[in-house]
Swiss-Prot record:
InterPro entries: MFS_dom (IPR020846), MFS_STP/MST-like_plant (IPR044778), MFS_sugar_transport-like (IPR005828), MFS_trans_sf (IPR036259), STP/PLT_plant (IPR045262), Sugar/inositol_transpt (IPR003663), Sugar_transporter_CS (IPR005829). It comes from Arabidopsis thaliana. This is Sugar transport protein 8. Belongs to the major facilitator superfamily. Sugar transporter (TC 2.A.1.1) family. Mediates an active uptake of hexoses, probably by sugar/hydrogen symport. GO terms for molecular function: monosaccharide transmembrane transporter activity; symporter activity. The gene is STP8. PANTHER family: SOLUTE CARRIER FAMILY 2, FACILITATED GLUCOSE TRANSPORTER, SUGAR TRANSPORT PROTEIN 8.
Amino acid sequence: MAVVISSNGNSKSFDAKMTVYVFICVIIAAVGGLIFGYDIGISGGVTAMDDFLKEFFPSVYERKKHAHENNYCKYDNQFLQLFTSSLYLAALVASFFASATCSKLGRRPTMQLASIFFLIGVGLAAGAVNIYMLIIGRILLGFGVGFGNQAVPLFLSEIAPARLRGGLNIVFQLMVTIGILIANIVNYFTSSIHPYGWRIALGGAGIPALILLFGSLLICETPTSLIERNKTKEGKETLKKIRGVEDVDEEYESIVHACDIARQVKDPYTKLMKPASRPPFVIGMLLQFFQQFTGINAIMFYAPVLFQTVGFGNDAALLSAVVTGTINVLSTFVGIFLVDKTGRRFLLLQSSVHMLICQLVIGIILAKDLDVTGTLARPQALVVVIFVCVYVMGFAWSWGPLGWLIPSETFPLETRTEGFALAVSCNMFFTFVIAQAFLSMLCAMKSGIFFFFSGWIVVMGLFALFFVPETKGVSIDDMRDSVWKLHWYWKRFMLEEDEHDVEKRTD
């Protein structure tokens, strides 16, 4: 799973330096992404550990031990899936509260609340003595994810110099992938620590949570948030501090003007339903759906379990997950380099073909060579791992970051916070659906699960081809005239809004 906020697209160039202080702020705030990534990666490894299964899911452990057991069904357990998915359901709910907290209290206090939720959740999960304590811990971690994923990207977007905003915001996505990789490495080493290795693995999230909590005391609130809450003098002083220059009048006035426009919209959620807001709203929500139905989080959540299913031993499965995590990190750098060179549409279309081929190859190998009680021969198992890695590469430079980048740059200012909150909630909902259903789907559909995701990749590729316009280099202020009004389908909604405005003025 992936989160990115773009530059605000404003064509004006304000005088600003990339200061050491801004760099420190970016790194500290982006630790929120590392925690999110760690939580994504840690659950699959922990659910593959025998000590964890014996403690909380003895029936799954007994099923796993029997060689004659159905390979695809040995991990099928609703409570086991709830251990992973409960975090994302909680994050969905929390994101609505976090949106209000960001507006009323600011970005920094919201990050601090996120870190407190993380710490309490880590303590409960790592120290759990029964399934209920374990799930409650995961739910509190989910609250941390909901608050962190709302506040951190907004913070990064508002504190970065305009010319560097896109790249600095992808640091959040980069930290997510690094968090996944660290979790995979931790899983690999703690799996051999009996009987409490799983407690160490779950407790590891407490370290970055502490860094975020105490590090947030060193960073400032964003100028936009301060001005939005009528702290204009403090906002201007903060702007001078983060830009490293004294003359910030032009950018300051731009922020004040943007905040004034935003205040005029009394009900942003109603505004989102207007015809002119429909294109970014529909695209933003569908991109979240499609991002999850690429199947990426099914692979990232359950990589160790998946590799065990195709015949790898426990340690080898965890090591294979480390390899995929490394590929994920490195491929994110490719996305940073390509997104403003090749454009958004090219990456979406290229990766759709790329991921489709990988899913089909994996599905064909499993359907042909893996029966329900056997294992894959070593060559076929290695081919599966290779194509999983190639698949992860394609996602990491396309549907991962772009699933968030495109909505962030197409929502107009007056509905951006609310639109983004809905995008976060939508993403968390479908992440929950996949996390809760994947192991049951794997049991019911067997290798067909990969053909299922292949079908959705075809649908999303066609959607990108016909309905996602290119937004590279287009100012947000010009999005309506330069993108939506020129698009073969979306222009009808712009015309409808224009006609409504004319009728309103006439009346």
